[in-house]
Amino acid sequence: MQIVDQMRDQAFEELNLVNDKKSLDDIRVKYLGKKGELTGMMRLIATLPNEEKPKLGQAVNIAKEALQNAINEKLAKFEEAELNEKLASEKIDVTLKGVGQNQGSLHPVTKTLNRIEAFFKQNGFAVEVGPEIESDYYNFETLNIPSHHPARAMHDTFYIDDTHVLRTHTSGVQIRTMEKQQPPIRIIAPGRVYRCDSDITHTPMFHQVEGLLVDKDVSFADLKGLLHAFLNSFFEKDLKVRFRPSYFPFTEPSAEADMECVMCDGKGCRVCKHTGWLEVLGCGMVHPKVLKAGNIDSENYQGFAFGMGVERLSMLRYGIDDLRMFFENDLRFLKQF
């Protein structure tokens, strides 16, 4: 039995030197594992006289139990220390001032789009969208701009291939809508458009909203009244609006809509180049050829169309003088909205 006591004492001496869980497990395996030293002592029982067997078995079991209890106690201390360390590292001082979350806001272009859509929805217009990679057919041909037409020079176009472009306007949505829907039609088509131009007032990508109304007995007076009401609503002012004759291949007659300068109330300033007027959108009565391309009978139905640059309206509403600021992701700029 002396050898069992010596083995037990040796195990406890080694146990006292252990400082981590891995070393602790090594001792458990060394003495209590299937091939452990104390476990191996049980095999000697078969070689002993019958009267000695119970004594050795009892001594080994007592030693194994004492060592297992000591190992469990030490393991519990290690786990408690680990838990305390983790709790300390994750400790929260509830007396400290909280860290607030920064509140985001909508981009000014998004706000402008929302204002535009809200007005026209209130006036019975639906919102329609279309592909940004558009066919030459929908971007030009159906809008009375054939391949030989000089008006194509007005557009600095990004060509994907010989028959597809990055759309230069959202007018193609109007044709697609007329093809699938008979009058009365009231839609606006907001979206990104692309032109090869970049300066203080132009970017290669910008946003447009185009509108279309097709019905019986539609007149230019209806168009003027709608757009005047829109500008008054958008700028929250009772504005003077004038319509100047212009040219667009897809409308006849065509006009440019100017409004009283919102910066100087029409008195003349740098923004309006001291004229008192600001050009804000183009419009006109839908050309019969465009109605025909959309499978609309131009003898029985008339329509008007209009288009506006969203960034242009944003700049005027918020007093921004450089279009490129909308796309620079500068928080100093965006936080103002």
Swiss-Prot record:
Write down how the cofactor binds this protein: Binds 2 magnesium ions per tetramer.
List cofactor names only.
Mg(2+)
Q: Which Enzyme Commission number(s) are on file for it?
A: 6.1.1.20
Q: Does the keyword Magnesium apply?
A: yes
Please, one GO biological process term? phenylalanyl-tRNA aminoacylation
Q: Where in the cell is it found?
A: Cytoplasm
- Give the keywords, sorted: Aminoacyl-tRNA synthetase, ATP-binding, Cytoplasm, Ligase, Magnesium, Metal-binding, Nucleotide-binding, Protein biosynthesis
- Residues binding Mg(2+), per UniProt: 252
According to UniProt, the reaction catalysed is:
tRNA(Phe) + L-phenylalanine + ATP = L-phenylalanyl-tRNA(Phe) + AMP + diphosphate + H(+)
> What Pfam families has UniProt attached to this entry?
Phe_tRNA-synt_N, tRNA-synt_2d
What superkingdom heads the lineage?
Bacteria
Classification via InterPro entries: aa-tRNA-synth_II, aa-tRNA-synth_II/BPL/LPL, Phe-tRNA-synth_IIc_asu, Phe-tRNA_ligase_II_N, Phe_tRNA_ligase_alpha1_bac, Phenylalanyl-tRNA_Synthase, tRNA-bd_arm
GO MF annotations for this entry?
ATP binding; magnesium ion binding; phenylalanine-tRNA ligase activity; tRNA binding
> Which proteins does it associate with, and in what oligomeric form?
Tetramer of two alpha and two beta subunits.
Q: Which family does it belong to?
A: Belongs to the class-II aminoacyl-tRNA synthetase family. Phe-tRNA synthetase alpha subunit type 1 subfamily.
Q: What is this protein called?
A: Phenylalanine--tRNA ligase alpha subunit
Q: Which organism is it from?
A: Francisella philomiragia subsp. philomiragia (strain ATCC 25017 / CCUG 19701 / FSC 153 / O#319-036)
- The encoding gene is pheS
